[in-house]
């Protein structure tokens, strides 16, 4: 469970920003997106392979320049 301590002397906006940052670090937003619908294991592997190829192409371009 994620919790943020709210200080009475600080504005609410700062506490809200800290909460959003903590949620981002914990990966809550990404996990919710992943759980919205089921993805088959084969589809996960295909996506991972596509991303690896894309990263390799980008690294090759950067190394070439």
From Swiss-Prot:
Transmembrane stretches, start-end: none
Gene3D superfamilies: Ribosomal protein S8
Record's keyword annotation contains Ribonucleoprotein: yes
Coiled-coil features, chain-numbered ranges: none
GO molecular function: structural constituent of ribosome
Domain of life from the UniProt record: Bacteria
Biological process per Gene Ontology, one example term: translation
GO cellular component, one term: ribosome
Disulfide bond entries: none
Keywords, in A-Z order: Ribonucleoprotein, Ribosomal protein
Presence of keyword DNA repair: no
Pfam families: Ribosomal_S21
NCBIfam families: S21p (TIGR00030)
Protein family per UniProt: Belongs to the bacterial ribosomal protein bS21 family.
Protein name according to UniProt: Small ribosomal subunit protein bS21A
Species the sequence originates in: Francisella tularensis subsp. holarctica (strain LVS)
Taxon lineage: Bacteria, Pseudomonadati, Pseudomonadota, Gammaproteobacteria, Thiotrichales
Recorded name of the encoding gene: rpsU1
């Amino acid at each position: 469970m994620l919790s943020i301590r709210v200080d009475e002397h600080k504005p609410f906006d700062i506490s809200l920003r800290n909460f959003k940052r903590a949620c981002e670090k914990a990966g809550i937003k990404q996990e919710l997106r992943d759980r919205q619908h089921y993805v088959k294991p084969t589809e996960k592997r295909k996506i991972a392979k596509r991303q690896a190829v894309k990263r390799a192409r980008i690294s090759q371009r950067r190394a070439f320049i």
